[in-house]
């Protein structure tokens, strides 16, 4: 098996399979260099071109990290890469400023497209333990679909006093209740609130 590949190409192929299997998306070229011990990205690109030419992978040059691992005979393997979107990680939220303003974005994180249901999705780091009963802990990352409205029971990111907070949303008779999922904390009652988006996912570092 792999008689037509050199040692580095085999290492790259195995590394990409492992990363896609574990994470759901392929590594970057720089990550490939570090994992295999290559000194330059141009060398890695050369090996990737050979792997593509020999039918082991398929690439889309118009998209970042767009690589599919193919089995021999050009049949798709279980390691097929789904399209990846680089989702912005928002570091701060300021009243009167678009949430995705360049100055608000600290970094980006690649997520499979089926995990992201809107181009205006962003990621926010959770501060505090007000949502622990919903499995959302301090320093978790919440995936947020940007929208200005919410239904009762939605977990939302709301702007209060120039600060973003994650709570469950309830519109009641004469106020809005932002309910924490922590029995030791009281709800926040307000006449009106700015909704920045609805939480659609959560992940954390272990």
Swiss-Prot record:
Gene3D superfamilies in alphabetical order: Umud Fragment, subunit A, Winged helix-like DNA-binding domain superfamily/Winged helix DNA-binding domain
Pfam families reported in the protein's UniProt record: LexA_DNA_bind (PF01726), Peptidase_S24 (PF00717)
UniProt-annotated site: Cleavage, residues: 95-96
An annotated GO BP: negative regulation of DNA-templated transcription
Keyword Oxidoreductase found: no
Catalytic activity: Hydrolysis of Ala-|-Gly bond in repressor LexA
Record's function text: Represses a number of genes involved in the response to DNA damage (SOS response), including recA and lexA. In the presence of single-stranded DNA, RecA interacts with LexA causing an autocatalytic cleavage which disrupts the DNA-binding part of LexA, leading to derepression of the SOS regulon and eventually DNA repair.
Membership in a protein family: Belongs to the peptidase S24 family.
Subunit: Homodimer.
Name of the featured protein: LexA repressor
């Amino acid at each position: 098996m792999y008689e037509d590949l050199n040692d580095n190409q085999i290492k790259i192929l195995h590394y990409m399979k492992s990363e896609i299997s574990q994470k759901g998306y392929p590594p970057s070229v720089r990550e490939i260099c570090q994992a295999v011990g290559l000194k330059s990205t141009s060398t890695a690109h050369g090996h990737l071109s050979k792997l593509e030419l020999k039918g082991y992978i398929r690439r889309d040059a118009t998209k970042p990290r767009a690589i599919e691992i193919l089995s021999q005979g050009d049949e798709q393997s279980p390691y097929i890469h789904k399209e990846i979107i680089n989702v912005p990680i928002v570091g701060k939220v300021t009243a009167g400023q678009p949430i995705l303003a360049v100055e608000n974005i600290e970094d980006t994180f690649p997520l499979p497209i089926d995990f992201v249901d809107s181009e205006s999705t962003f990621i926010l780091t959770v501060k505090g333990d007000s949502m622990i009963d919903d499995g959302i802990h301090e320093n978790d990352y919440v995936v947020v679909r940007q929208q200005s409205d919410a239904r009762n029971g939605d977990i939302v990111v709301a702007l209060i006093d120039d600060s973003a907070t994650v709570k469950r949303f309830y519109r009641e008779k004469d106020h809005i209740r932002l309910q924490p999922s922590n029995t030791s904390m009281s709800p926040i009652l307000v006449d009106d609130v700015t909704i920045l988006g609805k939480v659609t996912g959560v992940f954390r570092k272990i």
